[in-house]
Amino acid sequence: MFDTGGEAPPATPAATIVIFRNDPAGGPPQLLMVERSAEMRFAGGAAVFPGGRVDPADFALGERIAAETGLAPDEAAHQIAAVRETLEETGLALGLAGEIDATKAQAARAMLAHSGALAPVLEAFDWRLDLAQI
């Protein structure tokens, strides 16, 4: 252990999702990881699971959907962040429901890169959250 010389900094709310599948060829399960940009301050160049910080827009959407999902707003926000980060980093539309195909998922990913928030993407594509998937 080491002495940090004081109190630890406050934790940053974040969410990560671990995605794996059975190998279609019958081999061992496959695990999805992404490589962080080498220019990133934290863990630049590292192989990581999709995920990241819970943004204020995730907390706002979490508040809006908490009652209908039965989740606490904070828990909903963390799950929303996992869905958003997965779409943003991989193009996979996990935790979402509606008419979703690869073309729409890529368009949604591009929109998300521009807006940074999941709620406008849901509205634009007439999608809804299906957090039971995750």
Positions of predicted regions on the chain:
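N-terminal leader/linker segments that precede catalytic domains of diphosphate-processing enzymes
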Residues: M1-I134
